Structures are given as structure tokens and as C-alpha cells.
Design a protein with these regions (language model features):
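Long, glycine/tryptophan/cysteine-rich extracytoplasmic
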Residues: 26-78, 125-162
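Interfacial segments of alpha-helical transmembrane regions
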Residues: 5-18, 92-119
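Residue-level signal for alpha-helical transmembrane segments in multi-pass membrane proteins
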Residues: 20-27, 96, 118, 122, ...
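N-terminal signal-anchor transmembrane alpha helix
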Residues: 8-35
Length: 188
């Protein structure tokens, strides 16, 4: 039975991972900044696990001209439950740290990976929806487009820059802390 237990150091790494997951919910996960000659300082859409922030009203006013749907919490139902999923993941990670079973660690890593893949898929789906479902009656006609999850994009006179937020970096660090015990305790 001893061979299936995680070491105390690994358990502490898992507890730290749980703490990083909790900390992540207080920071943005993703953001997009819109730059144009009339907005050289940029307009932000900032995505937290439970809300949108930034100059959303201004962005929506501008997007109206190209027929893009409004950015709002109502259009992102994930914001109603993502916070709870992240807290649940932190609790499961902490329980794994306390119980110290390798099998539980494998489950947490798998769950974390699945949630990460679903998160990237969901964001890419939303960006595609917003960029390709343009109102044909809009005052300004542009070709449909898909804003990138990361990087730059140009539409008309707007340059957008998409980037990860600090919350995502905390999640990446938390995931790395989950992987270290796999290597550290590989012979246990």
C-alpha cells in the first residue's frame, strides 16, 4: 500500500496547486484589446471566470456598425458556472493532497486537462460565432472573420490583440505543480 502514496513534498505541491487555482479566479483569464486611430490607448474586453469587464459598451457600439452581436454576460453562459467549476477543481486537488493517493492525482490531472481543452474549445467557438455571424443589414459590410485566441488581428481600421490573463498563468502554474509529483514519485 505504501507504494501508492504520494510523498509529503508532492502533497505540499498539490496543496499549492489548489491555492493557485483559487487565486486564479480573482484575475482575468483572457483579454482582447482593440486599437484604432480614435482609440490609441485601446479598448478592453477582459474575461474573468464569472464576469466581463472593460469598455464593453464602447466596443459593442462600434461592433454594431459591422453587425456583430453584443458582448455581454448573457451571451456567455459559462460565466454563470465557471467559477464553481474552478473552486470544485481546487477542492478536488486539495483532497488529493490530503489523501495522497497516486490514482487520485491521475484523475485530477486528467480532469484538469479535459477542462483546459474544453476552455480553449469554448473560447474559440465563441470567437468564431461573434466574427462570422454578422448581420447582413449592418451599415458597414466586412467579410466574416475569426479573432485569434492569442495574437493580432486587423479588421477595418481596428487592430486587436488577444492575450492570456494572469488567471490563466496561475492555472498553468497549478497544472505544472500537478505534474511534478508524477516525476518525483515515479518509483514510489
Amino acid at each position: 500500500m505504501k507504494g501508492k502514496k504520494l510523498s509529503l513534498v508532492s502533497s505540499l505541491l498539490l496543496a499549492l496547486s489548489a491555492l493557485l487555482i483559487v487565486a486564479s479566479v480573482f484575475f482575468p483569464y483572457w483579454k482582447m484589446v482593440f486599437f484604432a486611430p480614435q482609440y490609441p490607448e485601446g479598448l478592453n474586453i477582459i474575461v474573468f471566470p464569472n464576469k466581463l469587464e472593460g469598455e464593453i459598451d464602447i466596443v459593442n457600439g462600434l461592433n454594431h456598425y459591422i453587425g456583430m452581436e453584443n458582448f455581454s454576460a448573457e451571451n456567455f453562459p459559462e460565466l454563470n458556472y465557471l467559477l464553481y467549476i474552478m473552486i470544485g477543481l481546487a477542492v478536488i486537488t486539495l483532497l488529493t493532497a490530503i489523501i495522497r493517493k497516486k490514482a487520485m492525482l491521475y484523475g485530477v490531472i486528467g480532469l484538469f486537462g479535459i477542462l483546459g481543452i474544453l476552455g480553449v474549445y469554448d473560447l474559440s467557438r465563441a470567437l468564431k460565432k461573434f466574427g462570422t455571424n454578422l448581420d447582413p443589414m449592418a451599415p458597414i459590410k466586412i467579410d466574416p472573420f475569426v479573432p485569434p485566441i492569442l495574437g493580432h488581428n486587423t479588421v477595418a481600421n481596428f487592430v486587436t490583440e488577444s492575450m492570456l490573463g494572469y488567471g490563466t498563468y496561475f492555472l498553468i502554474a497549478a497544472f505544472i505543480l500537478l505534474l511534478i509529483p508524477l516525476w518525483k514519485d515515479r518509483k514510489r
